[in-house]
Amino acid sequence: MEKQTLVWAHRGASGYAPENTLEAFQKAVEMGADGVELDVQLTKDGELVVIHDETVDRTSDGSGWVKDFTYARISRFNFNRTHPEGYERAMIHTLEEVYELLKPTGLTINVELKTGVVFYPEIEERVLDLTARMGLEERVWYSSFNHYTVQRIKELNPQAKTGMLYCDGIVNPVSYGALVVGADAMHPALYNLQYPNYMEDCKKHGKRVHVWTVNEEQYMRMVCEMQVDAMITNYPDVGRRIAAEYLDGTLTPELVRVIKKQGKQG
């Protein structure tokens, strides 16, 4: 029996609204996403804020490092830069505020801890404590490119669900993720799926696969055929449509192969 690939909205429905904002997460809910992916960093005064970059330059009208601003100061910036059309102003929000928005929805929440550049002290403890206080332990996945952070989450809470993010080539990545990092899921960049026997290795080690970032329809079809557990995409409405087509038989494996072949020729 075919299983449906879940659709997680990357930084919310970031193809349509300013990334990592309440507007983007609300749109993901409205588009029927199964989950959302978001990024967390710490302000100077210790607030967990939802933002991808270590600086505010790309996504706002401000400039500087997140770690150097208090929450009151960083909140003055306009975070609409990734989608100024239709969004005169967009705010940066705390993780707690995003949790409050998503708690009634039942959506899965993937929290990526951004500890690769700035080594935020005790951010793992802070995120776990907030998740527990909000009663969301069963719905939250924790991921990071910093594999020490992934290990630390497990040390603090062995029941926490963790994903190992990576994009560069790793020798035996699934064995490394399972046996060294101790992650529950692999979070590979899309192109990592081309490694020989990748899905078979994940199944052998009992690891889920949550792949990022899948924005083109031909690759959405490909990951559905591969029965990836979740695709992380900026366009959750498109992902949901294609995942549903694959499950109901509209999108057959034969058709997927034809589409992939046409894509290579184009």
Describe each PLM feature range.
Residues 1-266:
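Phosphate-group recognition and catalysis centered on beta-loop-alpha active-site segments
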